[in-house]
Amino acid sequence: MKKTKIMSLALCFALILSGCASMNNTTKGGLIGGGGGAAAGAIIGGLIGKGKGAAIGAGIGAVVGTGAGVLIGKKMDKAAAQAAAIEGAQVEQVTDNNGLQAVKVTFDSGILFGTGAATLSSSAKASLSKFANNVLKQNADMDVDIYGYTDNQGWKNSTAEQSRQKNINLSQERAQSVSTYLMSCGVTSAQIKGVQGLGEESPVADNSTAAGRQENRRVEVYLYASPEMIQQAEAGTLQ
């Protein structure tokens, strides 16, 4: 019975979101903030966080009102536009664990790093510097999570399990390199809530092709409303 209820709720919320394709975050923020509620937000947030051990954004345990959702949506619209101007960044609109709009920024690891390496290239530093200064520091009231991923290719003279662990370690080092560099550009450690390498987990493309493997070698940065931002939005004071 519990499983049936969860599936029904997820389906209902999916139908709500299917009507949002042409809306910006401001409109969707109001719809999700007012109608989705905490339960639906937990489901959608759980889907975003699948394989990460936790959903994006800490659940606040309460329904976020429509007006607050609209204000947060406006902020996310602005952050998404700022991020879209960064070379090498792919921007998507996603939903956090509170059912609120968030921003996902994906960087191709082939652009950031050399093969099998976790040292940032010069061009990567230039892009990340702009990302830090033009996006993260301009939205200091947003929390940030950073996740690193690899393809499923094995390592020379290693078993499948050894390769899997090496890929996890490499993705962790890459995510940490991005985090460390962003902080060197003035982003505070308090803003970056999580840094994790997930190796081969959650591929976004087919690992049987070279193009697919390149897509899977990536670093994802999530920007989502902090508890303080949600409080300000609820109070109507969020700028």
Protein language model features and the residues they cover:
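Bacterial N-terminal signal peptides that target proteins for export
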Residues: 1-10
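Solvent-exposed coil/turn segments that connect beta secondary-structure elements
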Residues: 88, 94-96, 108-110, 116-118, ...
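Extracytoplasmic
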Residues: 86, 98-102, 106-108, 130, ...
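Amphipathic, membrane-active segments
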Residues: 75-104
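Short, low-complexity, glycine-enriched hydrophobic/amphipathic alpha-helices that associate
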Residues: 21-84
